[in-house]
Amino acid sequence: MIIVTNTIKVEKGAAEHVIRQFTGANGDGHPTKDIAEVEGFLGFELWHSKPEDKDYEEVVVTSKWESEEAQRNWVKSDSFKKAHGRTKDTREQREDRKGIVGNEIARFEVVHVQNPVTIEK
């Protein structure tokens, strides 16, 4: 299992704009059904942090995949390109990057999972 994170650093106050782009709340973000129907997709979470001692906020996009191949197939898909404002297989994105300072993508292999234990009463 693979977890991919995209940590997006944004100017203070700009996080809601970025969150809407990923949740599809403004009509042009990740349509839930597009990623949910991708073979090998296991889940998606969006995290938001407001560090008090920093002049920025962070939005962390996390996706869980059966394999690295499944995740790479999503990135190559037309649905991914459309959701990210791309028309070609390129890193160039739409110009609407309001408030985004930068981002960092990381891939992790899951080596252990601890699930909660159910205690019978």
Swiss-Prot record:
Residues making up the signal peptide according to the UniProt record = none
State the GO CC annotations: cytoplasm
- Site residues (Transition state stabilizer), renumbered to this chain: 74
Q: Where is the composition biased (Basic and acidic residues)?
A: 78-98
Which segments carry the region annotation Disordered? 76-98
Q: Where does the ABM domain lie?
A: 2-101
Catalytic activity, per the record? heme b + 3 reduced [NADPH--hemoprotein reductase] + 3 O2 = biliverdin IXalpha + CO + Fe(2+) + 3 oxidized [NADPH--hemoprotein reductase] + 3 H2O + H(+)
Gene Ontology MF annotations? heme binding; heme oxygenase (decyclizing) activity; iron ion binding
User: What are its E.C. numbers?
Assistant: 1.14.14.18
Kindly give the SUPFAM superfamilies that the UniProt entry links to this protein: Dimeric alpha+beta barrel
Q: What class of enzyme is it?
A: oxidoreductase
Which residues are noted in the entry as heme-binding? 84
Annotated GO biological processes are: heme catabolic process; iron import into cell
* Coiled-coil segments on the chain, per record: none
State how it assembles: Homodimer.
Q: What does this protein do?
A: Allows bacterial pathogens to use the host heme as an iron source. Catalyzes the oxidative degradation of the heme macrocyclic porphyrin ring to the biliverdin in the presence of a suitable electron donor such as ascorbate or NADPH--cytochrome P450 reductase, with subsequent release of free iron.
Name this polypeptide is given: Heme-degrading monooxygenase
